[in-house]
Each structure stands twice: as C-alpha cells, then as structure tokens.
C-alpha cells in the first residue's frame, strides 16, 4: 500500500486548547493526528470531534485491553466517532482481539483496527521479566493472534517489523525521532529508517509539536523521506 500521508502527529498534550492550536498550524493534507489517553480521558469524544472539524483524520490511541465483551463494547463506542484508526493490545489474547474485529464488522466500519505488540519503551531485559521469553518469541505469539483474528495491522518498533512481516498487514511505528532525543523509546528510529524497515505510518510527536513552526518541520520531514 502506498498512502501519501505517512505521518501521524501525536497530540501529547494535557489541554484541548494546545491540541487545537497545533491543529490550526498543520496542514491536514499532509498528516493525520493521534489522540491518546491523556486528552481523551480528560475531554472524551469532544476532542475527536473538534479536530475532525478541522479536516483531520484521527488515530484514536486508547489501546483497549480488557475482557472480550468490554472491548467489543468499547470498540463499538469508539467506531461511532468515525475515526480513521483504532488500536487494541494484542496481549489481551485471541478472544479479545476477535471481539474487537467483530465490533468493526458489526459496525460495517472502514476504520483500521491495529494491534499493539511489544511496547517500544520495553528493553530486551524487560521482555524477559514480563513475558518470560525473548522479545522475538513474544512478537511471534502476538503475530499469530493478529493473523487469526484478521485485524488490519500492528503497532510496533520499526526494528520488529521483519519478525512480524505479513504482506496483508500495515505497520504503524511510534518512537520515530527526527534529529532529537529518543525520550523513553528504546527502539526509536528516524523517519527514513522506519520506512526503509517496512513501516507504513510514522507516529511523530515532539519533533513536530515542540517546533515553533510545526508545519515547516512536517514538510521538512516529508522531504527527507
């Protein structure tokens, strides 16, 4: 797939005014925006609606992880907002993942449903401590869940794409940095590196949101690809 809008700008703010101000300074023809738990917990659907009114497609990053019935109902509610993309935690298991996909089918939704694999904040030692196995083993287990449930793709480190590779899936990579600090992502990469490794969509936050001219920075990143 070759979607020209490869960049998803992460709205990592604690106030709606900051998020809307950034949206006013970005071109919706060049990117999509990610609304995460911080903004959504505080403002609910209103933040999604306000940003959509500005012409942006939304990746609703809530990482649902609960019993199948609860996740099904949560997905139904989220899909009613007509978001472009929605995610769940694949560690919730096959039944939960199938429930999320069933919600999408029942809504006849075109929203992309993707699964979070191993968080980019986790080191290899963290993976051993949490999963009791190497990172690669856990990734393969989660890949199997995603394929069985037939979801649309993965949230993963660009360095994990080779392990998760499947021609029918899309790959969304957080922790992408353009010449700045990696923050708490152990598996960060530059935008060009992430695309070369097989990513379809790049989640970029501070590199753009922390710039005084965010749209110029966005255009610079796009040119670098």
State what each model feature region is:
Residues 31-85:
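Metabolite-binding pocket within alpha/beta catalytic cores that recognizes anionic/polar moieties
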Residues 25-26, 51, 78, 146, ...:
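Generic structural signal for hydrophobic
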Residues 8, 34, 59, 84-87, ...:
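Conserved beta-strand positions in the central sheet of alpha/beta enzyme cores
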Residues 81-93, 178, 187-217:
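Glycine-rich phosphate-binding active-site loops on the catalytic face of alpha/beta enzymes
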Residues 3-5, 66, 70-161, 167-168, ...:
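Conserved anion-binding
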Residues 28, 54, 81, 149, ...:
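Structural motif
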């Amino acid at each position: 797939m070759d979607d020209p809008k490869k960049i998803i700008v992460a709205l990592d703010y604690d106030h709606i005014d900051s998020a809307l101000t950034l949206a006013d300074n970005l071109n919706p023809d060049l990117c999509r925006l990610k609304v995460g738990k911080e903004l959504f917990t505080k403002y609910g659907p209103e933040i999604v609606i306000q940003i959509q009114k500005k012409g942006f497609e939304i990746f609703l990053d809530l990482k649902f992880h609960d019993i199948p019935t609860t996740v099904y109902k949560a997905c139904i509610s989220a899909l009613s907002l007509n978001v472009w993309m929605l995610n769940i935690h694949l560690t919730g298991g096959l039944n939960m993942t199938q429930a999320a996909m069933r919600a999408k089918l029942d809504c006849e939704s075109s929203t992309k449903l993707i699964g979070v694999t191993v968080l980019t904040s986790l080191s290899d030692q963290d993976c051993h401590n949490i999963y009791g196995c190497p990172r690669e083993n856990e990734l393969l287990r989660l890949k199997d869940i995603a394929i069985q449930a037939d979801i649309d793709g993965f949230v993963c480190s660009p360095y994990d794409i080779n392990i998760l590779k499947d021609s029918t899936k899309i790959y969304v990579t957080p922790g992408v940095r353009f010449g700045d600090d990696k923050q708490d992502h152990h598996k960060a990469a530059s935008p060009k590196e992430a695309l070369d490794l097989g990513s379809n969509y790049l989640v970029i936050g501070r590199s753009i949101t922390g710039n005084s001219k965010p749209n110029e920075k966005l255009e610079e990143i796009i040119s670098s690809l």
